[in-house]
UniProtKB/Swiss-Prot annotation:
Residues 1-28 form the signal peptide. Probable carboxypeptidase. The gene is SCPL30. Its main location: secreted. Pfam families: Peptidase_S10. One of its GO terms (biological process) is proteolysis. This is Putative serine carboxypeptidase-like 30. Belongs to the peptidase S10 family. It comes from the Eukaryota. Disulfide bonds join 99-368, 262-275, 299-336. Its EC number is 3.4.16.-.
């Protein structure tokens, strides 16, 4: 065989092996795609009791985050009402720690199906955020809602870092199940104690994107959005006290005593008994009303949660043992709605339809897990350094506050954000929706802060239409309306 023939034979063999490798890769990709498709379709929700008829798809179920410990997080995903493959994806987290994003975010605020007060069904939300984006609700950490672990020690190790690691693992595994959304613009949003969860998770996503040269491992994170969030302990607590005083919840004498006895420049505000005693007077006054919405009547039902918040255990423990603000008491326009939601998600047919249980061995679903709240280890005292880092990294950050929330009030948020010392890009001004002032907004270099006039802790439940306009502006990266005149 001459050299020319040998070279030609070698070329043919090389081409054959290359073609074989390509074929193997194609078969592998096809199998992976089929596995993803089957896993996704197994989570398709098709017969949810009381659900209004809709044209979009939604999925619910579990995503494992630690197979050796039997740990899995529950999610509920709603495709955008149109162009879901093109619209951004928003992950929503509620706070507590220990409260459910399914029970609050999805069913009382921004999801397409809201709890009906007849305790049996759902009603369509005309202001659902999936009009603008794909919405992914996650019950995090384990022990919240339907999320669980088969290893009891996991529940003893819950803290801020545990939560963010599991949430990141969830995202990686969820994108394997829904690969068609991997390239979508991705945002993380939440409220209350998610003010800690969200920046922590955003930083982890950002850092891993920076470390991974393989673009297939990247998550297309563009920014985060927070409502009435925990940000920085000293500033949050000082704002909590000042807001109660400025809204005539506490007396001048109580306000003076607290400022004299409590060191708000410390990471540990509760460093002496005298401070705790002074703070107890704020609790005493707030116990008479709905702290999450100062001007909404409190729920007077006989629910277990209502009884708990009236108990001596709650009043004694919620500051001294946890050193944090409590999870939500009775929020929303209808402060009894939490009880309706609990009835619905503990129905066998509902749990089976959502793939939360087999409909026989039921999960005991609650809107907030008080054991998680009281046993939580608070590792992070301030997320302001994360804000600075991610602003420098080019992420979009918007923060909003309902101005009638006494739990994490607008004043504390302003104190915290002012500590960043960011240059002002656009001066404080009103922003408008439907020809009315919705609130006020100030744009900083790298951050936008806005208020919602007349809204409590869960802003979308008070101001659904303007909240939808707000999320639309956020994902599009455009300023909030500066005029009463509507433009098309």
């Amino acid at each position: 065989m001459d050299n020319h023939t040998k070279s030609f034979s070698s070329l043919l063999i090389s081409l054959w092996f290359t073609a074989l490798l390509i074929l193997v890769e194609m078969v592998s990709c096809a199998r992976q795609h089929r596995r993803s498709f089957l896993a996704k379709e197994a989570d398709l929700v098709t017969n949810l009791p009381g659900q209004p008829d809709v044209s979009f798809k939604h999925y619910a179920g579990y995503v494992p985050v630690d197979k050796s410990n039997g740990r899995a997080l529950f999610y509920w995903f709603f495709e955008a009402m149109d162009l879901p493959k093109e619209k951004p994806l928003v992950l929503w987290l509620n706070g507590g720690p220990g409260c459910s994003s399914v029970g609050y975010g999805a069913t009382q605020e921004i999801g397409p199906f809201l709890a009906d007060t007849n305790e049996k069904g759902l009603i369509f939300n005309p202001y659902a955020w999936n009009k603008e984006v794909n919405m992914l609700f996650l019950e995090s950490p384990v022990g919240v809602g339907f999320s669980y672990s088969n290893t009891s020690s996991d529940y003893l190790n819950l803290d801020d870092h545990f939560a963010k690691k599991d949430a990141y693992t969830f995202l990686c595994n969820w994108f394997e199940k829904f690969p068609e959304h991997k390239g979508n613009e991705f945002y993380i949003a939440g409220e209350s104690y998610a003010g800690i969860y969200v920046p922590e998770l955003a930083e982890l996503v950002y850092d891993n994107n920076e470390k991974n040269n393989d673009l297939s491992l990247h998550i297309n994170l563009k920014g985060f959005l927070l409502g009435n969030p925990d940000i920085s302990n000293p500033d949050d607590w000082r704002g909590w006290v000042d807001y109660a005083w400025s809204h005539a919840v506490i007396s001048d004498e109580t306000h003076r005593n607290i400022n004299r006895l409590c060191n708000f420049s410390s990471d540990d505000v509760w460093n002496n008994d005298k401070c705790n005693e002074a703070i107890a007077e704020v609790d005493k006054q707030y116990n008479e009303i709905d702290i999450y919405s100062l001007y909404t009547s409190a729920c007077k039902g006989d629910s277990a949660k209502s009884s708990y918040f009236a108990s001596a255990q709650f009043k004694t423990n919620y500051h001294i043992s946890s050193k944090r603000m409590p999870p939500r008491r009775l929020a929303g326009y209808d402060p009894c709605l939490d009880d309706y939601v609990k009835v619905y998600y503990n129905r066998a047919d509902v749990q089976k339809a959502l793939h939360a249980s087999d409909g026989v061995n039921l999960k005991n679903w609650s809107i907030c897990n008080m054991e998680i709240f009281h046993n939580w280890t608070y590792v992070v005292q301030s997320v302001l350094p994360i804000y600075q880092k991610l602003i420098a990294g080019g992420l979009r950050i918007w923060v909003y506050s309902g101005d009638t929330d006494g739990c994490i009030p607008v004043l504390g948020t302003r104190y915290s954000l002012n500590a960043l010392g960011l240059p002002i890009k656009t001066a404080w001004r009103p922003w408008y929706h439907e020809k009315q002032v919705s609130g006020w907004v100030q744009e900083y270099d790298g951050l936008t802060f806005a208020t919602f006039r007349g809204a409590g802790h869960t802003v979308p439940s008070f101001k659904p239409s303007s909240s939808l306009a707000f999320i639309s502006a956020f994902v599009k990266g455009v300023p909030l309306s500066s005029s009463r005149v509507e433009t098309n």
